[in-house]
Amino acid sequence: TDKDSYNIAKAFEEAFHILKCPIDNYEILDDRPLKEIPKKLEALLPGKTIVLNIIKAVPEEIPFRIKWIFKVEENKKIKMGHMPGITEGMMLNSVNVDFERMKQTAIFLHKSFLNAEKLHITTEEGTDIFLGVKDRIFSNDISIKAGEMCNLPCGEIYCAPLESEADGVIVFNASIGDIGVLKYPLKVYVNKG
């Protein structure tokens, strides 16, 4: 964790104490942005089964985060919750959900995509895109197995569409990763992928 995400990490720590789960914390101090995995952080990995990345989203740290994810995934026993940029509002409104209900909805949606060849996605904000998905594998991040990771908040069902079969417009009107909340909608026009 870090000073910006301390309260969220503390909430997880309190929950783990209630569950009698042993924990180790690593706090990133002011040495930002991280470029490499700190040795003391890496030294905490042996014997762990859960790793939570509760940190401020610093765009310049994306290469570090990728290295860290790969390092954690080397141990096929660890489940990782990845939360760069998580806020208390996200914890209260997006993470505080009925996960069993979310999982059942994801299973239903996943089944509905089996054998799909093309998706047509529209929104009131103006997204109108066709995606070719024939023979693509759909995944979700609702439940993970040892050796896997997911972002929190979670709830995604996704696949990699065919690279040459995407046509239309996508409207981004909320937040984009580490960039934050957009002031104005961003339209991206896609032609043949």
Language model feature labels by segment:
Residues 1-169, 174-178, 183, 191:
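Active-site bordering "gate/hinge" segments
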Residues 188:
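Hydrophobic/aromatic beta-strand elements that line small-molecule binding cavities or substrate pockets
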